[in-house]
Amino acid sequence: GVVENMSRSNVVLWAKGALEKGEHINVVDDQYRSPTYAMDLAKGCLSIVEKEQSGLFHLSGKDLMSIIELVYRVADYYGLDKSIINPIKSAVLNQAAKRPPYTGFDLSKAKEWLDYTPMSFEEGLDALTKELVTLN
């Protein structure tokens, strides 16, 4: 999702913005994530409360992908130049915190107990694009 004046962006908005400006970007190809649309996360949390559930529930997007794949898909979705995306390994980054290679979750409990149905990555991009239009 989009929040005006965020102190920190997310990978989708960062990649979109950089590619729109024609900036060459370095993107790790050895880390995997389940991108999560903020409204899906909020709906999942609300469902826990409404269904009076407790315990551990994994809530995330339903698509697991590498960060480089995510950025390529952003470029494809918005019709941006993928040739300026440079795949790199995590080891060459001097990240302040070590990142795990995989952070995907098993959503089966949330789907069964909460009727959790997160958007696909492209559905999330559709929703994000509508938010961006509304803000401008």
Model-derived features: positions:
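Glycine-rich Rossmann NAD(P)(H)-binding loop
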Residues: 27-32, 57-65, 113
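Mid/C-terminal beta-alpha module of Rossmann-like enzyme folds, strongest
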Residues: 44, 51-96, 136
